[in-house]
Amino acid sequence: MAAVVPPGGYPLPVANQLRQAAGAVRAMVLRPQGLAQAQRYLMAIEHAHPREPLWYLFLLVVDPLAQRTGLGTRLQQEMLNAADNDGLDCYLETQKPENIPYYRRFGYEVDQELRPVPSGPPLWTMRRLQQ
């Protein structure tokens, strides 16, 4: 599954933000300190997000059984083509270091490495410059 935000679509609509908040409330019930940590990550994402128009790969998820089959490429190819046609950059965030080489294959480079929670995983922002 890919969730792509077109230019001008960020920040996300209120309905999407409420769905994210619902996930944070569930985290708080299960682990109260998790809410504060989640809030720090969300604030870091908001602060780091570029303000100029670009294509935003908000989410890319492939079932482990379907990984390494080209599905992830196909899921994001339409966005990459649209960005190229528009002459705009693409942007994403990841917390998984193993994703960095994957996204580099598509022309993304690490823009920033953030540590919203000192004891938590880093958050990398990546950008693919207009092609």
Feature annotation, model-predicted:
Residues 62, 68-81, 105:
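Conserved acetyl-CoA-binding loop-helix of GNAT-fold acetyltransferases
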Residues 53-55, 108-131:
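Long, positively charged, glycine-interspersed low-complexity recognition regions
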Residues 73, 85-87, 96-113, 119:
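Conserved active-site alpha-helix within GNAT-family acetyltransferase domains
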Residues 39-47, 78, 82, 105:
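Hydrophobic, well-ordered beta-alpha structural blocks that scaffold small-molecule cofactor pockets
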Residues 58-67, 91-100, 118-119, 128-130:
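Conserved beta-strand-loop-alpha-helix junction that forms the acyl-donor binding cleft
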Residues 3-61, 67, 117-118:
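Conserved acyl-donor/pantetheine-binding loop and adjacent beta-alpha core of acyl/acetyltransferases
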Residues 53-55, 82-95:
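Conserved GNAT acetyl-CoA-binding A-motif
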Residues 1-2, 112:
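A structural microfeature
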